[in-house]
């Protein structure tokens, strides 16, 4: 069963078409990376999924039921924008308030569980206003986990975090899918981090889905290349273009060769031409470069 099944979804705000005939499929249990530039329609789509906005047209099914179904709506955890917390209250008291809003009876055990899941069990007595950005985001996720949701919708939860905060967030999201058995829809502009956790991707542009794929399909679509440095970038690029089909130069002078060729053969060829290679290695393009090329920003 799919967690989310969207067909022909559109949303207009006056004359602005925010979402345009969008089709989208999120399998149950996936960590679905939702990708697009600012204004592409990501947040609008997420808000329609959560019932915070009404579609102009189209359908949204969650676990085979209409997204307005009361039972389904009660099983969606949401973190869109900043978590709504009282700054002078402790983390624990904010969690208790949220549990009361959700009419959770005897919530202490569940609150302790979700705080442990998001690595915040040692900060329960801290005032919310004294928490770091990363801690606040994890508190927001803990609130979204109250009530044991089947679907978790997170809008840009890792933006602005430092390296350690991102690492913790990766661990938290992985634990959530394993221990709560819920599906995670997550949007982010930090594609390098998203690539480390996502099992599926959807890329949206101008309100339309332009590509959906699994992590395995992304891996297959991202070519391996040989990278090298010689200190004579542009000159060597011209030399190599005479022998190989796809040769590119990065801003720092690194040359990339995308042909199916061995690095030792490249070194030998350049040696014959009187060029000494200072560094050479094999690498693979990732999600960020894949996205840039898909958007038409391919380097020449």
Q: Can you annotate each of these PLM segments?
A:
Residues 1-10, 297-300:
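ABC-family P-loop ATPase nucleotide-binding domain
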Residues 4, 11-186, 191-205, 209-211:
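ABC transporter nucleotide-binding domains
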Residues 66-67, 231-233, 260-261, 285:
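Short, surface-exposed acidic/glycine-rich loop or hinge patches that mediate macromolecular interfaces
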Residues 72, 236-239, 266, 270:
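Hydrophobic side chains in well-ordered alpha-helices
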Residues 103, 119, 243-244, 274:
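Glycine-centered loop/turn motif at secondary-structure junctions
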Residues 170-258:
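ABC transporter nucleotide-binding domain
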Residues 258-300:
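C-terminal coupling/interaction segments
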């Amino acid at each position: 069963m799919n967690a989310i099944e969207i067909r022909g979804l559109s949303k207009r705000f006056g004359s602005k078409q925010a979402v345009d005939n969008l089709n989208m499929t999120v399998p149950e249990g996936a960590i679905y990376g939702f990708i697009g530039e600012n204004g592409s329609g990501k947040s609008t789509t997420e808000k329609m999924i959560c019932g915070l906005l009404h579609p102009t047209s189209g359908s949204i099914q969650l676990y085979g039921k209409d997204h307005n179904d009361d039972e389904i709506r009660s099983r969606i955890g949401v973190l869109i924008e900043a978590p709504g917390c009282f700054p002078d209250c402790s983390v624990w008291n904010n969690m208790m308030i949220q549990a009361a809003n959700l009419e959770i009876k005897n919530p202490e055990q569940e609150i302790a569980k979700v705080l442990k899941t998001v690595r915040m069990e040692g900060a329960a007595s801290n005032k919310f206003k004294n928490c770091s950005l990363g801690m606040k985001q994890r508190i927001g996720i803990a609130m979204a986990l109250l009530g044991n949701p089947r679907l978790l919708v997170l809008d840009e939860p890792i933006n602005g975090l430092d390296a350690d905060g991102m690492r913790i967030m990766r661990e938290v999201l992985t634990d959530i899918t394993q221990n709560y058995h819920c599906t995670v829809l997550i949007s982010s502009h930090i594609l390098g981090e998203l690539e480390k956790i996502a099992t599926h991707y959807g890329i949206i542009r101008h309100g339309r889905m332009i590509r959906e794929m699994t992590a395995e399909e992304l891996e297959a679509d991202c070519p391996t290349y040989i990278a090298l440095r010689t200190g004579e970038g542009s000159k060597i690029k011209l030399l190599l273009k005479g022998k190989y089909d796809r040769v590119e130069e990065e801003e720092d002078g690194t040359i990339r060769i995308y042909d199916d060729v061995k690095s030792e053969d490249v070194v030998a060829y350049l040696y014959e031409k009187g060029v000494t290679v200072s560094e050479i290695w094999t690498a693979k393009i990732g999600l960020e470069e894949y996205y840039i090329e898909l958007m038409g920003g391919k380097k020449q």
